[in-house]
Each structure stands twice: as structure tokens, then as C-alpha cells.
Amino acid sequence: MQLKTLDIVCSREELGRIPEGKVLINTINAHSYNVAQKDADFAEALQKGDYLIPDGASIVKACRWIKAKSQPKERIAGWDLFIHEMERLSLKADAEFQVPSSNLPDGLPEGGSLPMGEGGGRGSQGSLPIGEGGERGSVVMFMGSSEHVLQLIRERCAKDYPNLRVVTYSPPYKPEFSENDNRQIIEAINQADPDLLWIGMTAPKQEKWTYRHWDALRIHCHVGTIGAVFDFYAGTVKRAPLWWQNHSLEWLYRLLKEPRRMWRRYIIGNVKFLRNIMVVG
């Protein structure tokens, strides 16, 4: 995979021009670029998604340095994408019919849960409001992470976006999903039929899973693979203060906070990124 030939979103303004419908939005940074050099499936998932967001100052600078096809003007973090899409859906929900809880489907109580799957995954806050004439409230779904993190996300969403209905699904915690796991995840997503879907299983797993099962997802909404944002929004991991973000040093902040986990990714990884850019482009 060559950075020089990738189609990358160049500014935050472009996020507002993403069309309605089933759209896959991935992010790319130095680490994911490095991984893609050795993982052909991951590289294919990134290249064949609909939109690719430059989630790293290193990507922005490297595109300028090698005179790449895309010239992003700024870093667009996964967090920026998340806030943009949540605000977009919230504004849309404000203009739609507000559905009373009495119109919930039979057998599913308000604030109810999707059933526990055989593989351990389960959906929670699975209320799907159905309005008269088949209309329903706007639904945002979070697929991934632990039930603890998802509970915190539901609580924060209730405060930040009270006009949105939240559905969550915590998949089994394992390196690879079984066919049964995949079937249950797909069924949960299709049952929720969300107006916005977030996939959070860390790269490259989340991108490869979403791309591999794209055709099986019978949905018509924006889908973002945003891994760490689940933890940021839940508050289980804190983002760098604005000064660090504005000076393109968020990576250094994370390294200082979690040196044992991040040293290989950022110290060795940044060197590999420079080498890959010079060799591969």
C-alpha cells in the first residue's frame, strides 16, 4: 500500500459533504500504515473503504513531503469524526418525530437488552423506538469494547445526546471470532438497523472485520471504525490536553502515560514509518 496514491480526506469541511447512505469511513495513521505494509487484508480494507481520514500529523506531513495524490490540510482525529457524526445525527433527530416509549416493540422493554449470544457477546440498551407509520427515532449503535465501557458510553450519550436512541453490543473478547460469533454480531447490527454505526475493536481487527462482512450488513448509514474513541468517550482513557493536540504531540502524551504499552508503537513505529515512506512511498 502506497501513501502516495491513497485517496485521503483533506479537510474537516469534507466530512460535511459525505453523502447519506451506507458509507464506510476508516482512519489512517503512522501505526496503521506500518501494519498495512505486512497485512494485505488490512491494506485492502483501508484502500477499498469509502473514506479515509488522516488521523495523524505524520500522515499529513508525509503526504506533503512525498507529494502524494492527496494533500490533507490538517489532521482529522477519530474523535473529530465521532463528534461530527454524532452532532449531525442529533440535529437530524431534532427534526424528526419524537417517539413515545409506549410505542416500543412488543417484548422489548424501554432500555431493554438484546439477548446474550452463545459466544458471550450481547447487546444492551437495545430499545428500538417505532413510530406511527413505521417511523422511528434516530438510533446510534456502538459495536465493540467491554460491557463496562459501553455502559459508560450509554450514560454519557444520555446526557450529551438525549434525543438519540443508543444500542450497544459487546462481542466476545478473543483474537478471532468464530463463524457463530460473526453471525450473531451481524444479526445484532441488522436488527438494530442503526442510523449511525461505530465499530470499536482496535486496528486492524475492526477495519478487516467490517470490510469482510460489509455486504452482510443490511444497513443504510455511515459506519466509522474508531477503536480508541470508545475509551475516550467513556472516560476510561483520557485524551491529551488541547495544547498537546494542537502541537501534534498527542502521540507523545500517550507514550508518557503508557510507556510500557506504547513505546514499541511510537518509538520503533515512527522510525519504521519514515523508512516505509522512503522505500514504499
Where are these regions (language model features)?
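Conserved beta-alpha
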Residues: K67-D94, G137-A188, A192
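Intrinsic disorder/low-complexity segments
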Residues: L91-G137
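Proline-aspartate-enriched helix->loop->beta-strand connector
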Residues: I189, D193-W198, T202-A203, T210
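A short helix->loop->beta-strand "cap" motif at the edges of active sites that frequently abuts
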Residues: K22, G137, R218-H222
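A transmembrane-helix-recognition feature enriched in membrane-embedded lipid enzymes
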Residues: K61, R239-G281
